[in-house]
Amino acid sequence: MDFAFATAPGSERPNEDHVVVSAGQAIVLDGVTQLPGLDTGCVHNPAWLVRELGDCLARALAAGPTTSLQLILAAAIDELRTRHAGRCDLSNPHSPSSTVAIVRSRGEQVDYLVLCDSSVVYENADGVTVVRDDRTDTLPAYDRHTVGRLRNRPGGFWVASTDPAAAAEAVTGSVACSGLRRLLLCTDGISRLTEFFKLAWTDVFGIAERSGPHAVIDAVRRYETDQPDLLARVGRGPVKRHDDATLAVLRRRTADRHR
């Protein structure tokens, strides 16, 4: 199995999303945007982090094709620490970080992992399943002090940054290849189609199948422009008018579709 993908920045800023695809696997990352004036203790930015983490994950997946995805992620974060090359304070709670979504074909199974608010969505005979780590939805507050205090802590939320232990908190699972109809991985710049604009995931799959993954991003931009008033969360800070958006969509061979 292989994947088609698309990614686009939400503004003139560098794209802080990243996608890596190869035969039988896909990785989607969403770097956490740094607040202005926040001391991160790091000389690097989120765009650097997602590129390096993507490379670390690809290397770990190649080295351990049957290793659990949690261990793959832990190894990648551990390698990522060395790439800071001693120039950064890796104990800083605001160090650059990223969400993670991984899908890997393994024999007759497809394994998946999700950390923080990126998503894996698939459809089989049981219907559409959305795999998402929703712990950021229930924080007691969203100011920078509270978020920093609860990041990668029990009772808080978990991201890929400088602590390999975060990998053990990822949401993981497997689904049989047989009967798997459709699958995608995406950042929250794509899932806002369903969260805010109330499309069904079957609609998103349909756009991708008819016109390709870039058309899904085009749909996001149209909704962001035409219905910006829907971009709101109760009890949360303002939502970006335009966010970085990335997705990887499974392209199944004809023979696979008839298995």
Residue ranges and their predicted role:
Residues 51-81, 203-225:
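Helix-loop-helix
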Residues 1-13, 76-84, 136-159:
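Short glycine- and acidic-rich boundary segments immediately preceding or forming the N-terminal edge
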